């Protein structure tokens, strides 16, 4: 049995490692696990042997897709690490990890600085107010520039970096760091086998001035936020190491400053001081404010829970994974109280009872069973039947619903056709399991063709889902070409649209009459629909109102122009009529559906398409070709800048124009340019494109 869970929460850190796709995040995590004694042999991403990349596809592709939770120990402290993917297609993994973390290590590539993906992940961390420290990695790489990277953190992220280490040497001569808090050099001599030992020495003479300059900046930054330290500093007194660390910690936990460290995880340099910084500066569960939620079915009744074992039990399910032996694993963050394995709790989001089977603390895909789950920790649970991502589990007698998570809709879809009858059955199981694991994976049946259509966040995302269907669920299927996930919406408000549903066949008939307003709507947190009931005086019995709402939502699945989902609308039910005998829930559902279609047709419907933020890095010589090509793809150039000797073009381009871009870019620039893209927003398509989309969808 590994070390048990720590009950002193001041010694616990729940952290994520976040970064751009190739900044060296998984390698950094591997080194952490090695130095904290979890691994006896270092796993390399490029050998396909890393601990946190435990799915076959991850090991083959050398990228991290699922955020594995890993527990390790450092200097009597417990660190629970979530390794998040940096590839844009897997934003959902990053988003749900950040929701349950207390702090994070942002890893940057020392040559590239802040890249588009790092920017996106940084913004997601801002959304959840996650304190961070920055690790400038790959300092051994040709062209690595620590000071440039620090500048990009300030300029591109608008953050306040606090440099607490400087590199000694660069590229092949990178041998260690200067610790500006302790004013000592930490040097890894030679290629020490695995970097376990480093020497603490005096600062090299040629770097003494630079160290003094950055030390002064550091002291001034921390002193100006604390009156007592400021007086001491201006009085000419030295601040103690503990005072400096305490002040840095306070500023980091408040997300006012972001300490910046450096190293080379691959060359085993700088990882242990980074672990010290995780303990010294990132928050423990006790530093984080009480978690708030509401009473079930009463959203305005806010309640909170302190991160204490004395409070009633509450936890958030943030990830579902399928384990080869145990089946469904649910990862939970426990916010308050304790619970024994085998206990019965309630899923307050769904109002269903659940029994906790076995509880584990995970080490990538190895399990360490524990008897009890307690506040401040992350666990994997077996045996939960109805719980999905974002659900709250809590004490049945003192219920709370914690804030859930919002996930983006898919931007790309493919049709998938099973090859045989038995594949058809297996496909059903595969889709259900994968959808449980991944809230951004959506499935629907194309009403025209009868094909199953799956949607996701990008081509790589769908590739990997299809690959998992083949490998894990043994589904053989033909996969169509990627299609863009268009949406429909309306431009203007229409008032008092009426529809009467009437059917008279032998026996009891059907009758329902409804009157609605329909208007454009954009809600908070990405909500795309609202229903308001203004019916008075029992014109429609109360029990039928939800049926009108349900009918309207059904009709939203297929828009009126080209059959794409209808979004960003508000329905107000004004009036109606019913019949004592012939009215029913079904009749009002049909009326709700039909009146919405009728109203949408009159409300200037338009088609929306996903727009991607594209960043191309190219040598100067190819700038003209790159810009011309982006313009021909209906792209809008947003900015151009210089970065490490290359030119960077930022543009917004419709996703439909970006298929096959990687090959075109390669041939236009002789393979010397590269690009990345992230989903930005939905925008109305031009009229000529709209005509083409409608013609294609309606077969005209």
UniProtKB/Swiss-Prot annotation:
Compartments in which it is found: Cytoplasm
MF (Gene Ontology): GTP binding; GTPase activity; translation elongation factor activity
Q: InterPro entries per the record?
A: EFG_II (IPR041095), EFG_III (IPR009022), EFG_III/V (IPR035647), EFG_IV (IPR047872), EFG_V (IPR035649), EFG_V-like (IPR000640), EFTu-like_2 (IPR004161), G_TR_CS (IPR031157)
SMART domains, per database record: EFG_C, EFG_IV
One Gene Ontology CC term in the entry:
cytoplasm
NCBIfam families registered for this protein in UniProt: EF-G (TIGR00484), PRK12740.1-5 (NF009381), small_GTP (TIGR00231)
Entry protein name: Elongation factor G
């Amino acid at each position: 049995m590994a070390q048990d869970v720590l009950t002193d929460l001041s010694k616990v850190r729940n952290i994520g490692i976040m970064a751009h796709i190739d900044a060296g995040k998984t390698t950094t995590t591997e080194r952490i696990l090695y130095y904290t004694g979890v691994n006896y042999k270092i796993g390399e991403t490029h050998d396909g042997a890393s601990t946190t990349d435990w799915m076959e596809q991850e090991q083959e592709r050398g990228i991290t897709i699922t955020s594995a939770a890993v527990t390790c120990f450092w200097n009597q402290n417990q660190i629970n690490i979530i390794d998040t993917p940096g590839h844009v297609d897997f934003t959902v993994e990053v988003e749900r990890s950040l929701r349950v973390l207390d702090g994070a290590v942002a890893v940057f590539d020392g040559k590239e600085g802040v890249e588009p993906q790092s920017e996106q992940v940084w913004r997601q961390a801002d959304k959840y107010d996650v304190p961070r420290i920055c690790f400038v990695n790959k300092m051994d790489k040709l062209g690595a520039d620590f000071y440039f990277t620090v500048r990009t953190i300030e300029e591109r992220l608008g953050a306040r970096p606090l440099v607490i280490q400087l590199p000694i040497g660069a590229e092949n001569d990178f041998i260690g760091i200067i610790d500006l808090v302790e004013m000592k050099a930490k040097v890894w001599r030679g290629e020490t086998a695995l970097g376990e030992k480093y020497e603490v020495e005096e600062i090299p003479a040629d770097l003494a001035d630079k160290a003094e300059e950055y030390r002064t900046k550091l002291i001034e930054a921390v002193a100006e936020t604390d009156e007592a330290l400021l007086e001491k500093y201006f009085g000419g007194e030295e601040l103690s190491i503990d005072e400096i660390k305490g002040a840095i910690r306070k500023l980091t936990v408040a997300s006012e400053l972001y300490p910046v460290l450096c190293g080379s995880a691959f060359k085993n340099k700088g990882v242990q001081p980074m672990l010290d910084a995780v303990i010294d500066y990132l928050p423990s569960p006790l530093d984080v404010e009480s978690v708030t939620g509401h009473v079930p079915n009463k959203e305005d009744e806010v309640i909170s829970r302190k991160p204490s074992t004395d409070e009633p039990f509450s936890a958030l399910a943030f990830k579902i994974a399928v384990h080869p032996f145990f089946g469904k694993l649910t990862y939970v963050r426990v916010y308050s109280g304790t619970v024994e394995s085998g206990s019965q709790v309630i899923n307050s989001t769904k109002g269903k009872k659940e029994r906790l089977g076995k509880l584990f603390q995970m080490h990538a895909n190895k399990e360490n069973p524990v008897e009890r789950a307690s506040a401040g920790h992350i666990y994997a649970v077996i045996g939960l039947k109805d719980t999905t991502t974002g659900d709250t589990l809590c004490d049945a007698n003192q219920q709370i619903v914690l804030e859930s998570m919002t996930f983006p809709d898919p931007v790309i879809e493919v049709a998938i056709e099973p090859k045989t009858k038995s594949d058809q059955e297996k496909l059903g199981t595969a889709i259900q399991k994968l959808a449980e694991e991944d809230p951004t994976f959506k499935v629907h049946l194309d009403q025209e063709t009868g094909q199953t259509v799956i949607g996701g966040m990008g081509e790589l995302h769908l590739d990997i889902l299809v690959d998992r269907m083949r490998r894990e669920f043994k589904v053989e299927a033909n996969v169509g070409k990627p299609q863009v996930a268009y949406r429909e919406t309306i431009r203007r408000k229409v008032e008092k649209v009426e529809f009467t549903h009437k059917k008279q066949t032998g026996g009891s008939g059907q009758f329902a009459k409804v009157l609605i307003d329909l208007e454009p709507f954009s809600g908070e947190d990405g909500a795309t629909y609202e229903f308001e009931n203004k019916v008075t005086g029992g014109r429609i019995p109360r029990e039928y109102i939800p049926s009108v709402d349900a009918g309207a939502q059904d009709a939203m699945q297929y828009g009126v122009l080209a059959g794409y989902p209808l979004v960003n609308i508000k329905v107000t039910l004004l009036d109606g009529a019913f019949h004592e005998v012939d009215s029913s829930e079904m009749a009002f559902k049909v009326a709700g559906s039909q009146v919405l279609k009728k109203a949408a047709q009159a409300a200037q419907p338009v088609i929306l398409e996903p727009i991607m933020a594209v960043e191309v890095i190219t040598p100067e010589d190819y700038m003209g070709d790159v810009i011309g090509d982006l313009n021909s793809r209906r792209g809008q150039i947003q900015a151009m800048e210089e970065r490490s000797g290359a030119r960077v073009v930022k543009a917004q381009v419709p996703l439909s124009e970006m298929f096959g871009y990687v090959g075109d870019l390669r041939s236009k620039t002789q393979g010397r340019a590269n690009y990345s893209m992230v989903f930005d927003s939905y925008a109305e398509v031009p009229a000529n494109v709209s005509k083409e989309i409608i013609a294609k969808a309606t077969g005209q």
